[in-house]
């Protein structure tokens, strides 16, 4: 019976070789580590580990040895038997919940390191024949097919994730093998391979790669794209150089390289600081590749409709050449651009969270200049930034943006209330900037979700969930009330940063529901505020707002919510049911008794466009969690900044990097304020025939 997560790549009809018991296996490893040869004081501990692991690796030279061990154990266990087999060491641990041990003797926090034996599976070659593992193959390659169409593969259950092609004399590996992107462990050790194809970079889920005992001369740089890798064993090959691109393998625990004609610079680094030290050195020393092409601009209306703002063009980086003080036509007075950007707060940008980023590219001194180049280059009329701390707002953003003609508003998160002056300087929050040549501000305010006015409403019951889940979070939103100096049109801008943790989806929904309640109150108040601009200074006729729903509203920021989430559904549809799954069966009084709704006709600027597939790009997550929402009855989106070039992304594991200063990318949209249409006069033609 074969392992359901593990296949040897063949059907082996013969008797399986004997296997070591766990005690004998561990004893064999310890005997190598404690051998007199390794007690030489001139050998570093890191290199002793290399020698010990290389010796262990050489014991796995038989055809499909790891798969045979797993299959033999499964057969001996009988029906229903389940036991964990560690393919790296050949050892077994009893019980279905035992964790797989790495060759380092530690544990990986991933299910892929443990193989549970319950059912059988087979894998045929593309020719439809079965390889006989009793003799070594001499074919030029072994091609492996999925045996399923793309439509069927989506429904196919993957009962194995490990593949053992070790010790069978392979000379080449077919690129079809790398279509198995679900693989977590690949063993191609002790063959006759001379190269690893660059297509290996497609195995994004690979945790362990063993290509020891071959004649490989070079490591493909594409291996650096496999950020899930914990072990790469390349013992006994012909490798002399380790490509700097492997510096992105921030989770790599062991790079087995003993038995290679390695250049001294790499060998010395491993001897001194081990795999972690080598990877860090490679990461910081990796040459910076060419920058990506400029992000394009998507026009959503025709040129005949005067769609392009003086400050927006299809060559978006040319925005700095635009004259922001240039007189505008009447229709262009109604146009403006807005940016939303989570800039990644200085204290959040740590090597622990962003281990794939060079330390110099992670430093605030480097990133802040890139951020400011983006802000100046895109030249938006309104800019909403998240994760801006007090210190950098006061000393960097506010002064720099003032020189560019902006005025700013900043509020830190609620925790600042409990801190002294030194501590509060590093608390981040939301900052909104607007061009003083175009807007005047009526009012600014902050919504603190742990003490929002919505919590004091009589119909809101403060349940234990509200106290323990919502009011313990210190997220905020910043609202600014703006008036256009040229036409008197009003605009409400909400700059939001919603809670991040997916385990608190309910909190996200509650926060956004509170936000919409507050915006309704603010819009009602703003509608009745007197204008700050005398009528004789206006170039256009001042608009009127007979009801608060007529005022243009923009809600921008990092919502930490993708399309289809409760937050997205609530904003786009105008309501959320009391039993929505994102409430997570928690009691929030009125929210979970009758659901919640808002009266605004909100649309996502990027919602119906294919211009942007993600706003957050890291090895563990790629998705659109930042949004620009607008009131469709009063605003029309006329243009959008497109996403990052796909060819560039194919060689990037995540942001930030040398070209992108945050793990988020900025959103930029152009809007046009809709004008109330004057009713057509009634027809004076007399169609009555008498």
UniProtKB/Swiss-Prot annotation:
SMART domains in the record: LRR_TYP
Requisite cofactors: Mg(2+)
Main location: cytoplasm
Biased composition (Basic and acidic residues): 145-156
Biased composition range(s): Low complexity: 110-144
Enzyme class of the recorded protein, top EC level: hydrolase
Record-given protein name: CCR4-Not complex 3'-5'-exoribonuclease subunit Ccr4
